């Protein structure tokens, strides 16, 4: 009832609502709760790109959404306010408007001098005060609010250095505005922002902090002053996301990866962990990917587990992992009757001949082991998640459909693709964003071609979207005699012009300190940042096979400039290639997605199967 307007943020007691108008914060009472509905302006310094709005670049005159968050006391709010005024513009053009129009947005490149400045703002709606917290420590630092204690006395947050290799866990007293540094962590070469995890318990008296200080992600129990009380988990496996916490029982339920032998290390397995001492109890016994949902009491949970080759089971279990009741059984008989077949799992070695890589293989429905099929690798480099499916699904990014044309289709992991296999595995690609996954993909295909006589290792294709598009183009230009055809969609081919946070974290950025003297001889320190990455444009000249480049011309994530630069490099090298620009499309292709898929199918059929019928395609309905 109360949240019918998305731009309003209601207080927990529903007495107040806060919103943004013309970049400033406003509050008023909820008339349905008997409160005064007079609008009160809380701030006056909000401007475009230094706003209190969710979208700091908005030019809306009316009410808009804010990222501000209420505290439990329904009095205080907090917000990370972003100052983007010095950022440079980026553009896309919508050619489908009546008069083609320019869309301008702020965008940071790796190594930029002027980047977003983050402020932590505390608002008191009763006292009508807005205060900026003094949290400055590092230039261009990132701020990540975590939680507020139940008594609304303290807000916990993380601040991270621009180079991503240092982080502080801090608290701020909402009454005095005093900031306290609790835990300082140095993590070289970087602390993965997608794998971090902190739990604040008992109003800050207990802190569960995840760290990779041993080379493996594990949890450590600190007191409220930052003193380490005990290690909770350890060993050569990864403790991951927390599923539930029983504060009275002093127990944590969390996912773990790679602890159990002969089980894919990417599978989510559930474990029971004690807060006050080290040790884990496995709760997942079935070989599969587990997703759990605990009941409020933490006495029971629902466990849905499956594999790509095993249908889901949905079980009610107790908190000791014992099955009580199967709740439901999916019915996919229609899929089987239509000829659908489960994909198959496989394991190969990485190019180091040591590391196991897990993959999935799709075959045609009419597969004949006496025939020989070209192979297509569907790729994504990571490094913040692995792209190989682990759960049962009928929707697999067109892999099943592609296989029906007469291909063996695979998705295989590679070193550096996921944080769930330990720090050494995950950081494999640091400083080498373009090349790190390529050798493993090539070597995996070579092993499969030797293992299975039905795979033609001389007819190899590769396809990917976004980072996968970047990887597909890099692969065919790095190993031009191996990959014969590649479809590269919306690829970030030149990471010098891609997302700053992505490039500086996963490829690395070097902080350069310089001492500057003013006219009076006073010295101050200035910081600059150097970013070095290898773009695909440097290797475009190596292309021998067939390459299709695809982009949406309204893509504000991976700007079409990436694809245009790659195309220009190919033109300058005198290379023949295919290119599809989808008008009006962003990073996804929307209503044109099926059109793109058909283009891709015909491209691979022509260049890997020798099927040229698509060259003579026509619309049989055109004369109706």
For each of these PLM feature ranges, what is it?
Residues 36-39, 128-132, 178-180, 227-231, ...:
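Predominantly a core beta-strand signature of beta-propeller blades
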Residues 30-33, 124-128, 174-177, 223-227, ...:
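Short loop/turn segments that connect beta-strands within beta-propeller blades
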Residues 147, 152, 289-624:
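Serine-hydrolase catalytic core recognition
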Residues 22-28, 87-92, 117-119, 164-170, ...:
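Structural motif
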Residues 34-69, 78-132, 322-333, 387-398:
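Predominantly five- to eight-bladed beta-propeller fold
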Residues 2-18, 27, 48-76, 104-112, ...:
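Conserved beta-propeller blade repeats
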